[in-house]
């Protein structure tokens, strides 16, 4: 793995055993956080994060995207998040999309939004017919995040040439020989901004005294230039990914750079 790819992989790593805040901190967290707690309304958390996505930054050419772990910053129980997404996948309402850098890191996109933007991006293109064929079959409604050769070629009758066109259209990426990940056309631009924004926000906190900052203070600061996705979007990222510890204080939640 070359150095550039390693840096990207490191940027997407999520600390698996860390919650956004511990259960003992629940009451203090909900009373002092500037953001809503969706413990009683899990579906609302999905809509909330979608609404944070800066459509204008991408000229409305991307569907609203967020990272799965960002939901962990809005609900106290990670199991609830996992069950919610599994249920929405089974219903064909959301798609989980592999980022390609860490097997445990997924982008979340509403199925209808992905369908709409994929059709729009291929309009007038030579690949429009095969894109529509892909969107009209039940692959998007499947809870699978990748597809094998038998499923693509035998069950859904896609030829090698059509699969190649879907890869070029950005709806598939090669997983390995004979299998493909579902993808979002143009998502590379989002990933670029996401990585730069995460690094910029963590750097800002590291420069603070004791490498910590009150959540309420951070949330009201003007976003530095590299936070193109927005301050709140990135705050939910670093909390949900366990890159900062949430420390309850009399003044509110303190975000401290995690050293573990």
From Swiss-Prot:
BP-aspect Gene Ontology terms: positive regulation of Ras protein signal transduction
Q: Where is this region: Winged helix domain 2?
A: 126-185
Region of interest: Winged helix domain 1: 38-110
Q: Which UniProt keywords apply?
A: DNA damage, DNA repair, DNA-binding, Nucleus, Repeat
Q: Which family does the UniProt entry place this protein in?
A: Belongs to the STK19 family.
The protein's assembly and partners: Monomer in solution. Homodimer; when bound to DNA. Component of a transcription-coupled nucleotide excision repair (TC-NER) complex which assembles and interacts with the multiprotein RNA polymerase II complex when it stalls at DNA lesions.
Q: What is this protein called?
A: Winged helix repair factor 1
């Amino acid at each position: 793995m070359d150095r550039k790819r390693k840096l990207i992989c490191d940027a997407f790593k999520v600390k698996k055993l860390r919650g956004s805040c511990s259960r003992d901190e629940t009451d203090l967290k909900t009373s002092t956080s500037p953001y809503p707690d969706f413990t009683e309304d899990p579906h609302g958390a999905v809509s909330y994060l979608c609404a944070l996505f800066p459509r204008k930054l991408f000229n409305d050419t991307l569907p609203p995207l967020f990272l799965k772990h960002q939901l962990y910053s809005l609900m106290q129980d990670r199991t609830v998040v996992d069950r919610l997404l599994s249920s929405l996948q089974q219903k064909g309402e959301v798609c989980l999309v592999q980022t390609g850098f860490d097997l445990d890191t997924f982008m979340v996109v509403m199925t209808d939004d992905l369908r709409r933007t994929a059709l729009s991006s291929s309009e007038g293109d030579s690949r429009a017919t095969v894109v529509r064929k892909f969107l009209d079959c039940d692959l998007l409604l499947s809870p699978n995040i990748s597809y094998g050769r038998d499923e693509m070629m035998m069950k859904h009758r896609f030829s090698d040439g059509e699969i190649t066109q879907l890869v070029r259209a950005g709806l598939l990426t090669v997983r390995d020989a004979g299998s493909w990940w579902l993808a979002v056309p143009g998502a590379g631009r989002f990933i670029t901004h996401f990585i730069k924004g995460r690094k910029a926000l963590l750097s800002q906190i590291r420069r603070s005294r004791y490498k910590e900052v009150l959540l309420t203070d951070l949330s009201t600061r003007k976003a530095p230039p590299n936070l193109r996705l927005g301050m709140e979007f990135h705050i939910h990222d670093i909390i949900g990914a366990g890159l900062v510890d949430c420390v309850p204080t009399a003044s509110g939640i303190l975000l401290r750079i995690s050293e573990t």
